[in-house]
Swiss-Prot record:
The keyword Ribosomal protein does not apply. The keyword Iron-sulfur applies. It comes from Rhizobium meliloti (strain 1021) (Ensifer meliloti). This is Alpha-D-ribose 1-methylphosphonate 5-phosphate C-P-lyase. One of its GO terms (molecular function) is alpha-D-ribose 1-methylphosphonate 5-phosphate C-P-lyase activity.
């Protein structure tokens, strides 16, 4: 008897994968629309990426190369545990390089490296409904999506302007997909929103606890909501990355000591490591880089 006959590749059984793939196909056909699916119990608690893991398990093949990131980093707890999980249940190749991966599962970030055709970005989504905190009743939000009644969302953004003088929302910033559905891009910083627009990669969103899947196909128009007199703007950082000197990237603040010392470094660890490998150095590494260069000479 073949041992593979009783083995489920990538943990989920084939009937479950088929059901999730049907939901994915419907989501791709209707960009931004939340497709219900029968979420399964996974060997991790809800809120730790069960939706993204189920989507990844359903599309993962033996020849795929998997990359998992958590807020841009490859070495954080969530990323390491999910990567180890798929290595164990699927024995697929894994990588930390964005350019080498065919499937990238992410929590709260989009890689700085521009994604290409053939790649798939799988988002872990805690709350898929962009109107949830404005209208908690699911029956009402479904009607609002069906009738394209998104005035409430614009009122929320206007209230930001009235209170703060600008739109203060910095993450989970709502977008309109292909001129139709308003979508929650998951709690990614609004810095990443422009990367979703006309991306060459397929973007899939899985919410396990909420039992929803939605998608943005390649080359799809994704526009962040704004006003003519208050256009959408991304966050700006005053300093470059302290390790690689990169500018125009999303930075994380790192506390260095208990005296107020801090530095800002690339959220995307692969992007930062790649730049340093090519000789770039930020303020924190510049002295060490200079010393090593002088020693080599």
């Amino acid at each position: 008897m073949n041992d593979l006959a009783t083995y489920n590749f990538a943990y989920l059984d084939e009937q479950t994968k088929r059901m999730i793939r049907r939901a994915i196909l419907k989501a791709i056909a209707i960009p931004g629309y939340q497709v219900p699916f029968a979420s399964r119990e996974m060997p991790m608690p809800y809120g730790w990426g069960t939706g993204g893991v189920q989507v990844t398990a359903s599309i993962l093949g033996p020849d795929d190369v998997l990359k998992v990131i958590d807020q841009g980093a490859d070495d954080t707890t969530n990323a390491v545990s999910i990567r180890a999980f798929f290595q164990k249940v699927a024995d697929v190749a894994v990588t930390t390089r964005t350019t080498e991966a065919t499937i990238i599962q992410t929590r709260h970030r989009i890689p700085e490296e521009q994604l290409r055709e053939g790649q798939t970005l799988v988002y872990q989504v805690p709350i898929p409904e962009p109107l949830r905190f404005l209208e908690p009743r699911e029956t009402e939000t479904r009607k609002m999506h069906a009738l394209e009644e998104y005035g409430l969302m614009h009122v929320k953004l206007y209230e930001d302007i009235a209170r703060n003088g600008h739109i203060a929302t910095t993450y989970a910033y709502p977008v309109k997909v292909e001129g139709r559905y308003v979508m929650d891009p998951s709690p990614t910083p609004k810095f990443d929103n422009p990367k979703m627009h006309m991306s060459e990669a397929l973007q899939l969103f899985g919410a396990g606890r909420e039992k929803r899947i939605y998608a943005v196909p390649p080359y799809t128009e994704v526009v962040s909501l704004d006003f003519e007199d208050h256009p959408f703007e991304v966050q700006k950082f005053d300093k470059p990355c302290a390790l690689c000197g990169a500018e125009n990237v999303y930075l994380d603040e790192v506390v260095l000591d208990d005296k107020g010392g801090r530095m800002f470094v690339c959220s995307d660890t692969d992007h930062c490591e790649d730049r340093r490998a090519h000789g770039h150095a930020g303020a924190m590494l510049a002295p060490a880089a200079k010393e090593s260069q002088e020693a080599a000479e």
